[in-house]
């Protein structure tokens, strides 16, 4: 059985799910609209579910999401909040540090603290509500720090389903970042839809750009993405994630089985690519 890494899973405890999807009215509306499971689980229950579905490792971000319409923070999770739910399972659960460019150098220093003191394995960016594109120079100090720390940055790329400007995450914007920071490992999440071909082109061109499949069910993946991840140039450039509660493990894994991927491509999609990019040891 192929091992699985979920490179992006939202905080899962009842307290943090409430903070994310009930306390904030906009995200609460999304949860109702999509019928999301937001009951939450204890860390012990979560690990039991991981074992049940063959999930070896999960990465959880300290989400930093700003409301574009209200100009207030929707999600502003803290390093310690995520560390407290992952600390007892250091080989199974890992943190990603959320980027808020408005924190300026305090934010850069907090990124370093999260990695060096709490063992976080990367950074995480959701730029849409801030109203600036991913290649805005205000993000460059954070990207430079990621290079210095040798950790990847995960960023949502493609449209935004919320009331936020989707153009902030056009895949072609990654060209600027990858050219300026050729050592920065970039995980472009959410398949880049509806600009999947544009994101594939960026991943094909740049050795340091990877594609993440979060928030889009495998049976709906763009046919060009499926072809890319199943061929020589794309094997090792695409990784699996759920963005739970948007997607869940059993449904996704069944749909991936139904794609009929080559064994090497399937192993890299589910485990190998994320293991390499985030340097996750067995």
Label the predicted regions.
Residues 2-57, 234-239, 247-282:
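Mid-to-C-terminal alpha-helical segments outside catalytic/metal-binding sites
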Residues 6, 57-62, 98, 187-189, ...:
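Short beta-strand segments
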Residues 8, 50, 82, 114, ...:
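Conserved, mostly hydrophobic/aromatic
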Residues 11-15, 65-68, 101-104, 130, ...:
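Active-site environment of divalent metal-dependent phosphoester hydrolases
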Residues 15-20, 70-73, 108-110, 165-167, ...:
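Short aromatic-enriched loop/helix-cap "lid" or pocket-rim segments at secondary-structure transitions
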Residues 41-49, 77-83, 107-109, 171-174, ...:
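Alpha-helical scaffolding within the catalytic cores
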Residues 56-57, 62, 66-155, 159-161, ...:
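Active-site gating/metal-coordination segments in enzymes
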Residues 118-122, 131-239:
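Catalytic pocket-lining loop regions of alpha/beta-barrel enzymes
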């Amino acid at each position: 059985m192929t091992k699985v890494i979920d490179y992006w899973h939202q905080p899962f405890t009842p307290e943090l799910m409430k903070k994310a999807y009930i306390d904030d009215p906009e995200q609460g509306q999304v949860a109702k609209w999509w019928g999301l499971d937001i009951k939450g689980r204890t860390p012990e229950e979560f690990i039991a579910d991981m074992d049940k579905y063959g999930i070896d490792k999960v990465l959880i971000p300290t989400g930093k999401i700003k409301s574009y319409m209200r100009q207030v923070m929707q999600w502003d999770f803290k390093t310690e909040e995520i560390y407290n739910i992952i600390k007892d399972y250091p080989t199974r659960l890992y943190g990603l540090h959320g980027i808020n460019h408005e924190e300026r150098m305090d934010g850069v220093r907090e990124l370093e603290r999260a990695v060096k003191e709490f063992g976080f394995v990367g950074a995480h960016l959701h730029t849409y509500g801030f109203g600036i594109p991913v290649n805005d120079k205000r993000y460059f100090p954070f990207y430079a720090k990621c290079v210095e720390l040798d950790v990847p940055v995960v960023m949502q790329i493609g449209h935004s389903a919320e009331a936020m400007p989707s153009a902030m995450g056009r895949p072609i914007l990654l060209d600027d970042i990858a050219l300026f920071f050729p050592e920065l490992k970039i995980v472009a999440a959410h398949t880049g839809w509806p600009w999947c071909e544009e994101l594939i082109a960026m991943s094909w061109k740049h050795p340091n750009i990877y594609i993440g499949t979060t928030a889009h069910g495998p049976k709906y993946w763009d046919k060009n993405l499926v072809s890319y991840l199943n061929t020589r140039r794309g094997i090792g450039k695409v990784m699996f994630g759920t963005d739970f509660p948007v997607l869940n493990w059993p449904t996704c894994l069944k749909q991936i089985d139904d794609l009929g991927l080559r064994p090497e491509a399937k192993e890299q999609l589910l485990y190998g690519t994320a293991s390499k990019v985030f340097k996750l040891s067995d």
